[in-house]
Regions:
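Selective transmembrane helix interface/packing segments
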Residues: 1-231
């Protein structure tokens, strides 16, 4: 693997290299679209045929539609983070399908870091939007309106671990699926290097997209829940 070989040369972990490479691809794609939009036609007309810009615009429009439905009227404020997460995960997944490369999402450090970022982000949104009410919701029904307020400590003990478990589910789901997918492709490329691996690489493309979609979708759902008024 190229990143593993470079690790011994430059002294930087292959995971960090793969993550930086995915981020650079995302940045390059953004610059390409920006350059096309700033062109003579002002970006009003789509490119002819299939192009990077057209694909990215379709994906962004599709994500925006989902974000509008799941994050409410203020979705535009938080959509850049959701979009960045989606494309970073997608590019990191796709890198793992390229012979000689390994995707950053095949390592728990990357998936756990992404999950923690998502958790911190939607928790901060909840606190900013609702203040102390967001924290109090972990204590069950409103204390002044419930005859079971004495159960509040028990609700707190249950709800906080449940909320933190989202970090583990996000991280492990992405890691398990991408590690298994990349392993299957690598094994078949070793056993039968011609023909058969192409089938699994095609399936790998689908898996890479679906896992990025699921990660982004769950991020939207968690943000939407954080934006809801506490009851």
């Amino acid at each position: 693997m190229i990143f593993h070989q470079l690790e011994h040369v430059i002294g930087v972990s292959w995971v960090i290299q793969a993550a930086i490479f995915a981020a650079l691809l995302l940045f390059a794609g953004g610059l390409l679209v920006r350059a096309r939009v700033a062109g003579p036609r002002g970006g009003l007309l789509p490119d002819e045929g299939v192009s990077v810009r057209n694909v990215l615009e379709v994906l962004v429009a599709w994500l925006a539609g989902m974000a509008r439905d799941r994050m409410g009227p203020n979705w535009r404020r938080y959509f850049p983070v959701v979009g960045t997460v989606f494309f970073f995960v997608l590019f990191a997944n796709l890198i793992g399908l390229v012979p000689g490369f390994e995707g950053a999402t095949g390592d728990i450090n990357t998936t756990a870091a992404l999950a923690i970022v998502v958790w911190v982000f939607y928790t901060a949104i909840g606190i900013i939007e609702h203040g102390s009410q967001y924290i109090l919701k972990f204590m069950g029904p409103p204390l002044g309106k419930s005859h079971v307020h004495w159960l509040a400590p028990f609700f707190l003990i249950l709800e906080i671990p449940l909320d933190l478990s989202r970090i583990m589910t996000l991280a492990v789901r992405l890691l398990a699926n991408m590690f298994a997918d990349h392993t299957v492709v690598a094994v078949w490329m070793t056993l039968i290097p011609i023909g058969v691996p192409a089938i699994f690489m095609g399936l790998g493309l689908i898996v890479a997209f679906l896992q990025a979609f699921v990660f982004a979708l769950l991020t939207m759902i968690y943000i939407g829940l954080a934006l809801e008024e506490p009851h």
